[in-house]
Design a protein with these regions (language model features):
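Residues forming the Rossmann-fold NAD(P)(H) cofactor-binding site
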Residues: 24
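Glycine-rich flavin
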Residues: 2-12, 29-35, 40-147
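Glycine-rich Rossmann-fold phosphate-binding loop(s) that bind the pyrophosphate
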Residues: 18-21, 42-43
Length: 147
């Protein structure tokens, strides 16, 4: 947990910017070592891979591959019409991606990591602001992927 400073800002040993896999690993390891940690992201927690990239892509490609495979096997005795019903496939994908942000936030809370939502803006060498809330830190980890 953070320690308040005389000016009202919170102080952490580490502030992590980004909330994807790399950010989570860094935050959890530092917290496990007994240090105070905060994590901030302007998007839902989970990162690109879990929410918008790798994982959902695999689910969508799985449906496309199944249709393609059946169609290519049609001359070899596999019969029947197959098609992707996009609303159902998207519901399937969302059944995996929608719970991710809440699970991440719950995990951070259980470990004593403070979670912030918003855009982190550096205000000094060891300080930043998130939607008007000031944080000070000893170390910062920018784990924001390509952004």
């Amino acid at each position: 947990m953070s320690a308040p400073t005389p000016n009202g800002s919170k102080t952490y040993d580490l502030v992590v910017i980004g909330a994807g896999t790399a950010a989570m690993v860094g935050a959890m390891r530092v917290r496990a070592a007994g240090k105070s940690v905060a994590i901030v992201d302007c998007r839902p927690y989970g990162g690109t891979c879990a929410l918008r990239g790798c994982d959902p892509k695999k689910m969508l490609i799985g449906g496309a591959n199944a249709v393609d495979h059946v169609r290519r096997m049609h001359p070899n005795g596999v019969t029947g019409d197959v098609a992707i019903e996009w609303p159902s496939l998207m519901r399937f994908k969302r059944s995996f991606t929608d719970p991710v942000p809440a699970k991440h936030e719950q995990r951070y809370a259980e470990k004593g990591i403070d979670a912030y939502h918003g855009t982190a803006r550096f205000t000094g060498r060891n300080s930043l602001s998130i939607s008007g809330e000031d944080l000070e830190f000893t170390h910062v980890l920018v784990a924001a992927g390509a952004e």
